[in-house]
UniProtKB/Swiss-Prot annotation:
InterPro entries: Restrct_endonuc-II-like (IPR011335), tRNA_endonuc-like_dom_sf (IPR011856), UPF0102_YraN-like (IPR003509). This is UPF0102 protein HPAG1_0809. Belongs to the UPF0102 family. Coiled coil: none annotated. HAMAP family: UPF0102. Signal peptide: none annotated. It comes from Helicobacter pylori (strain HPAG1). PANTHER family: UPF0102 PROTEIN YRAN (PTHR34039:SF1). GO terms for molecular function: nucleic acid binding. It holds the Pfam family UPF0102. The lineage of its organism: Bacteria, Pseudomonadati, Campylobacterota, Epsilonproteobacteria, Campylobacterales. Disulfide bonds: none annotated.
Length: 114
């Protein structure tokens, strides 16, 4: 697992905090943040209409943050989600979302897997 320097980690945490507030305005209930497994981390786990949303938050100013979610990152997320569900509720309905934060604006991309 790669560790970010304090400046990058602080920026990421700030983006995640803002993302949680944005998601609440859309009717999401925050379940958990920064869930870790040996495979990786899920930034935000939220519930809406009975569906768990595993949300990757990406922020950036000088590039399009969506490109930071690679096929490799998605595979790690899926393995981490399996760990979470096996510990909590294996029968939960779920989807994987991305929340892009760029220049103070939010864009929620739901169900990003192929």
């Amino acid at each position: 697992m790669r560790f970010l320097n304090n400046k990058h980690r602080a920026k990421g945490l700030k983006a995640e905090e803002e993302a949680c507030e944005f998601l609440k305005t859309l009717g999401f209930e925050m379940v958990e943040r920064n869930f870790f497994s040996k495979f990786g981390e899920i930034d935000i786990i939220a519930l809406k209409k009975g569906v768990l949303h595993f949300i990757e938050v990406k922020s950036g100013e000088n590039f399009d943050p969506i490109y930071a979610i690679t096929p490799s990152k998605l595979k790690k997320m899926i393995k981490t989600i399996r760990c979470y569900l096996s510990q909590k509720d294996p029968n939960s309905d779920f989807c994987i979302d991305a929340l892009i934060v760029k220049n103070g604006k939010f864009e929620l991309l739901e169900n990003i897997t192929f």
